[in-house]
């Protein structure tokens, strides 16, 4: 004969149901917390990787295409050359140190052999025809004049095509910024004027970011926020080096990256050493 559950059996079943429900609740709750923590830490590791990769891009170009011969580390376009092409300046602002150096991040052209009576063959990469893009004309390892993209007359120059030399041609006579002319010869170079590269921190939307700015010639700086940080310390290497004469060959950055998730703050401090 079938009969219903007794009161005790009902209470036991209810208790087991509550225990199972609580177990599932806390399991889902804490798995969500652990997942959130893992995601926050994973993001921090990615911040550090991104920062190192981006900063390395600029340090690989430190000193490239930079004239020298001035009395200090100041560079001003067109003729205020720094004392040494590997000059580096360290400053500080708030929680972060600042690093400034000079380098070419864009176009160049190397004059090769004669193509015809009006042009030379050339190896070129990332050249432009913009009148606001400035270039130094180099002869025997020093700039002799200044020109602009629209005065050079480059044909071709796709640096994405590897193994093809020459990949461009250039006029033998180049009009300069002061309305004169320069006659090119084999071995001469036309190189985009160097940029002032600054690594620093400042706020964006109320949050402190590691940033890089590039400033070319008489143009305004172009700022690129990289990742959120709490602080950054920079040390010139080797320690005690003279930053004005090329003795400093690297910088050690100690950067504390930050990731805020709700009311929680996660940080990761990493040393990054970059140089030329």
Swiss-Prot record:
Compartment annotation: Membrane
One Pfam family per UniProt: N_methyl
Q: Which GO terms describe its cellular component?
A: membrane
Mind listing the UniProt keywords for this protein, alphabetically? Membrane, Methylation, Transmembrane, Transmembrane helix
Task: Indicate where this protein is primarily found.
Answer: membrane
Q: How does it sit in the membrane?
A: Single-pass membrane protein
Q: Which InterPro entries match?
A: N_methyl_site (IPR012902)
The name on file for this protein is Uncharacterized protein aq_1436
This protein's species is Aquifex aeolicus (strain VF5)
Q: Which NCBIfam families match?
A: IV_pilin_GFxxxE (TIGR02532)
| Modification sites for N-methylmethionine | 5
